[in-house]
Amino acid sequence: MIRAIVTDIEGTTSDIRFVHNVLFPYARERLAGFVTAQQHAEPVKTILDNLRRETDAPAASTADLITTLFAFMDEDRKSTALKALQGIIWRDGYLNGDFTGHLYPDVLPALEQWKAQGIDLYVYSSGSVAAQKLLFGYSDEGDITHLFTGYFDTLVGAKREVQSYRNIAEHLGHAPGTILFLSDIHQELDAAEAAGLRTIQLVRGDRDPASHHPQVQRFDDIHPEQIPA
């Protein structure tokens, strides 16, 4: 019996184009000015200090760090410091109404149904927890954060590492086999499966021939009550 569902965001609940064509450019355009203006104020000061440790560059100037952040964006590096800064910048965008968090139309009804069945819902994304809460708090369907019991980001581990999913299962307090992980990336599902979790792959486009995981196109194709123990 599935007791908890952990879902990815990009390509799973939300169109990856929203992230890459809206969120990333919005943060990139504002990053240098924001960091320069806020470098001595919290939480930016601590984030920059963390970035110095992350890059083993304790003497790096703010200008050096900004250059590093742009390089990380070009590489799509899953840097915790970068994700934290992006999340702060995106917050202004959501609050100003510059955009709303994209949700596929099949997502909300399924989440509500699973919640009504007594299944705990969680999010696991490479974006910061703050950014996750913003996307679901200012989504196309309004604030749906009340549906989620908790959120995980790269602080729990990288998404393609088996230990990350062991950490999540331990935090949830459920047996791994009672946790269902949803993602569009089969390498993430491979890691989750190796940790004992159940898996389903969202394929919003063509099927993934390299994947052995069950594949569905929509959230309403997922029936957790039918997944055998």
Curated annotation (Swiss-Prot):
Biased composition (Basic and acidic residues): 218-229
Catalytic activity, as annotated: 5-methylsulfanyl-2,3-dioxopentyl phosphate + H2O = 1,2-dihydroxy-5-(methylsulfanyl)pent-1-en-3-one + phosphate
Gene Ontology terms for molecular function: 2,3-diketo-5-methylthiopentyl-1-phosphate enolase activity; 2-hydroxy-3-keto-5-methylthiopentenyl-1-phosphate phosphatase activity; acireductone synthase activity; magnesium ion binding
Pathway as given in its UniProt record: Amino-acid biosynthesis; L-methionine biosynthesis via salvage pathway; L-methionine from S-methyl-5-thio-alpha-D-ribose 1-phosphate: step 3/6; Amino-acid biosynthesis; L-methionine biosynthesis via salvage pathway; L-methionine from S-methyl-5-thio-alpha-D-ribose 1-phosphate: step 4/6
Keywords: Amino-acid biosynthesis, Hydrolase, Magnesium, Metal-binding, Methionine biosynthesis
Entry annotated with the keyword Transferase: no
Domain of life: Bacteria
Alphabetized CDD domains for the sequence: HAD_EP
Entry EC number(s): 3.1.3.77
Coiled-coil spans in chain: none
Region Disordered: start-end pairs: 207-229
GO biological process: L-methionine salvage from methylthioadenosine
Known role: Bifunctional enzyme that catalyzes the enolization of 2,3-diketo-5-methylthiopentyl-1-phosphate (DK-MTP-1-P) into the intermediate 2-hydroxy-3-keto-5-methylthiopentenyl-1-phosphate (HK-MTPenyl-1-P), which is then dephosphorylated to form the acireductone 1,2-dihydroxy-3-keto-5-methylthiopentene (DHK-MTPene).
Quaternary structure and interacting proteins, as annotated: Monomer.
PANTHER family, A to Z: ENOLASE-PHOSPHATASE E1 (PTHR20371:SF1)
Family: Belongs to the HAD-like hydrolase superfamily. MasA/MtnC family.
Entry protein name: Enolase-phosphatase E1
